[in-house]
Swiss-Prot record:
This is Putative defensin-like protein 60. It is found in: Secreted. GO terms for biological process: defense response to fungus; killing of cells of another organism. Residues 1-25 form the signal peptide. It comes from Arabidopsis thaliana (Mouse-ear cress).
Length: 77
């Protein structure tokens, strides 16, 4: 009985490791790299609150520039 439990844990561990190694982790990294150029990201961008409104709000808050990055308004210093 103990051998079966150990085998099950080993198989589960290998499945988790294989799944993790085969997943595309660069998909998660890409937005972080692009937003790293911006200092502050806050409200989501929508059809009513777009790039122009975001840039205006950022400049109003005394940031150098701003725009929608991956669906969020991000301001640059």
């Amino acid at each position: 009985m103990k051998m079966n439990i150990t085998k099950s844990y080993v198989i589960l561990f290998l499945v988790v490791v294989m799944t993790n190694s085969l997943s595309n982790s660069e998909v998660l990294v890409a937005p972080v790299i692009e937003t790293a150029q911006n200092d502050v990201c806050f409200v989501p961008c929508t059809s009513r609150y777009g790039h122009y409104e975001c840039a205006f709000d950022c400049m109003h808050k005394r940031y150098k520039d701003g725009g929608c990055v991956h669906g969020r308004c991000c301001c640059k210093t």
